[in-house]
Amino acid sequence: MSKFVPGRRTALIAALLATALQPAVAQAAASKSLKAQAAADVEAQTKQIQVMVDQVFSYAEPGFQEVRTSAYLSDILEKNGFTVTRGVAGIPTAFTATWGSGGPLIALGSDIDDLLGVSQIPGIPNVKPLIEGAPGHGEGHNSGMPLIIAAAIAVKQVMEKNHIPGRLMIWPGVAEELLASKAYYVRAGLFKDVDACIFTHVSNDFSTAYGELGNNGMVSVEYTFHGKTAHAAGMPWEGRSALDAVEIMDTAWNFRREHLPVTQRSHYVITNGGGQPNVVPDRASVWYYFRDRTFAAVKSMYDVGNEISEAAAKATGTTVTHQVLGYAAPNFGNKPLAEAAYANIKAVGMPKWSADDQAFAKAVQENNKRKIAPLSDKVAELSTPENRPQSIGGGSDDIGDIMWTVPTITIRYPSNIPSVIGHNVTAAMAMATPIAHKGVVVGAKAVAMTVLDMMTTPKLLTDAKTYFTDVQLKTDHYAPLLADTDKPAIWLNAKTMAELRPAMEKFYYDPTKYDSYLQQLGIKYPTVTPQ
């Protein structure tokens, strides 16, 4: 046994610690360097980001009809070295774009569809449709995939330069406003080899979240009643009115609504009420969204809806069939991924808003009688189960289907104005302005930096998968209400776009002639008075 010499043990421990810590310190420095490269590569795409955001805004295509949008975005990815597969999961406007080899497979996605009836001239603070009755980006989905594409290109460049193994899969959220694609993506196996997924959604803040997120799950169902025609005045007793059945179902549902959980949300539109009043309608349809907080609660509402439809059919001497048009699982964010992403969000920070940006935001709020709140200069806090207000139900997002398949988070990025109304023209007013462009730039930086964390830190993905299996899957299990015979409702909105597209094409953005879409439309920024 060697003799103990005072000071020698201390020196030995210090030397061992220095040796042990050296790789970690080097890795941290390398990671910081990689992230700086990615941020710079995103910044270098600022002009292309503006063009993409404006271009998709001008296409203004609703769910399943995102033909120009899908082709435009997938072409950009293809030109940047990604392998594109179009028409995945039986959806013509869906695609995957893949790149890389070895290492983990990280999926990145955002939605691309817009909303019916919310056409809006961007960059003005008052309601004024570009085309009366046309669809428009009243949810800001024109900004999400440009963000994802910019982040993916930046990550690809960094990985190539630094010889980092790993793979990317880029995908668009088709028909999110119909909640009608992502469950089919999962069923088709698009995510079976994916290690983790980052999704993005437009907001007026900059943050992410984990745990049960408070979104309702949802099933979208159309009920079609079948009756018998007759002369409505001459021989009404010979008829069996399918429209009567629809009205009885709606009335019965509205009486039942009071006795359902307070977290439920349900709404409907009559999609077919017959032809003309003097013919007893032999066919009529009503389309329902049934929403609630859990898989079981959504199924319970679906079962009640089916029972009421059968009762309405019996009451009217008709028959009924129903078809599932879409599904969305409740949302659940992954804690390790959210914490990693939030560190990057804080590192990136909010955009540097100009006086013009603040003036336009205030003008939108004032002219539409909304609460006055400036564009924020601070990132929001990380949303956790402990600091989130208790949810009593609300909207849905079919990213939930992917969240229950692989570890997933949603990053909210600041491309819109506080206080605007969702699914409304006020939410479209800023979406082709510098406010939207700047929010996409910072969002793309945070996404790119988080992807690099996943590619270079195996423990992050291990922890994410452990949380997914040991925490998330202990709370519930994925149980979509899709039958094997259910197919994506790709016919939806086709008739609307066939009628409107010729007029809309005249307003598509031409970046070869105009620096911005606002310039093409003759809008001076900021316009703060009604036009």
Identify the function of each model-found stretch.
Residues 29, 247-531:
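Metal-dependent amide/peptide-bond hydrolase catalytic core
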Residues 42-49, 53, 57-60, 64, ...:
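Sec/Tat-exported extracytoplasmic proteins
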Residues 1-13:
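Bacterial N-terminal signal peptides that target proteins for export
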Residues 56, 77, 97, 108, ...:
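Divalent metal-coordination and catalytic microenvironments
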Residues 29-137, 142, 146-167:
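Acidic/His- and Gly-rich active-site-bordering loop/insert found
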Residues 113-127, 214-224, 416-424:
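Acidic-glycine-rich active-site phosphate/pyrophosphate-binding loop
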Residues 11-23:
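Bacterial N-terminal signal peptides
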Residues 128-136, 142-143, 159-281, 291, ...:
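Histidine/acidic-residue-rich, glycine-tolerant segments that coordinate divalent metal ions
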